[in-house]
From Swiss-Prot:
Segments crossing the lipid bilayer: 35-55, 65-85, 106-126, 145-165, 187-207, 236-256, 272-292
UniProt xrefs under SMART domains: 7TM_GPCR_Srsx
Subcellular location: Cell membrane
Protein keywords: Cell membrane, G-protein coupled receptor, Glycoprotein, Membrane, Receptor, Transducer, Transmembrane, Transmembrane helix
Glycosylation sites noted in the Swiss-Prot or TrEMBL record: N12
Record lineage: Eukaryota, Metazoa, Chordata, Craniata, Vertebrata
GO molecular function: sphingosine-1-phosphate receptor activity
Name recorded for this polypeptide: Sphingosine 1-phosphate receptor 3
SUPFAM superfamilies xref list: Family A G protein-coupled receptor-like
Amino acid sequence: MMINPLIYLHYNYTGKLDHRPTVGTSPGTRDPKTIAFLVVCSFIILENLTVLLAIWKNHRFHNRMYFFIGNLALCDLLASVAYLVNLLLSGEKTLQLSPVLWFVREGSMFVTLGASIFSLLAIAIERHLTMIKMRPYDASKNYRVFLLIGTCWLVAVLLGALPILGWNCLGNLPDCSTILPLYTKKYVAFCIIVFIVLLLAMSVLYARIYILVKSSSQKVSKHRNSEHAMSLLRTVIIVVGVFIACWMPIFVLLLLDVACERPCPILYKADWFIAVAVLNSAMNPIIYTLASREMRRAFLGLVCGVCYRGNGSGNDSGNKQFQEPSRSRSKSWSSQTHPNQSQQSSRPAELDREQETGHGEISVVAGGAAQASQREGEGGNGGR
């Protein structure tokens, strides 16, 4: 294919042609850095695919919070796919792309990033609404989850499609970004400001949720529920903190790109900043498994099930090994959907669920805190 003169013009104007990595004499030769990134992306795809399979195959995970976790895993998986495609179409192939393909290549990264941030914010909004309304979990209200998830993706796609719809710097070279030569600096600044504002709003909502949970739990049991609230806080800090730690460097770099009148040398090292951001997609599944014993058991059951199936024996015993310990806990998930059934066993099941789950804590903590006053009344009636 021939070099596209428009792409060449923008890359030459921003100085990216002079800072491109040297390529071997053989066509299609890739440097070790790119190969390493491709391997990492493949691992991230497999990792998040395992999360999605674990949630899909385990009915006890079919509730609001795990739907949100599944959506985050889907965002991470698609982000890795987008970055992998970006790598495969980079280097020599970049100059051969049409402007439309270039916008699709870069816009897909913005779409998955936006979907991840909007999904984290949707989790905070859904938990906050549940706490404010003080209602227990109701499986019939799952439509609200899918509505939020659909809205997240719709807004993310619209945000990522703005450049291809006309908000770009084609024909206006002085306004072009150095890192993204066909993007106008105004669009880059707009996206980063929106993302940072959303992260701040998310932090405020999670802080308010924690305060509500802690104040409600102290009315019931100062010891056990305070530990539960602190565990919730730690989980939230890990999820949001890792996201901010991974993405903030590239946000700062893009803001520097907007502010610099002349290209700064560090802007030509953006690949490393993007790689750190993509690592967030690898960290999330690790957080899920470390924070939730249920998730660990589901992963082990899934992996060992594949191993047993490959060996052709022991499949049934392997599945029983990982399914039997969770039967008693699955009752607690069903009791959350039908709170009027077996009220005498609801409190032990809830305490067991609080101890056994990490991210699961987030899904039940709103219901547990919302029923705090009801449990006090039940405890008083039992004492009489």
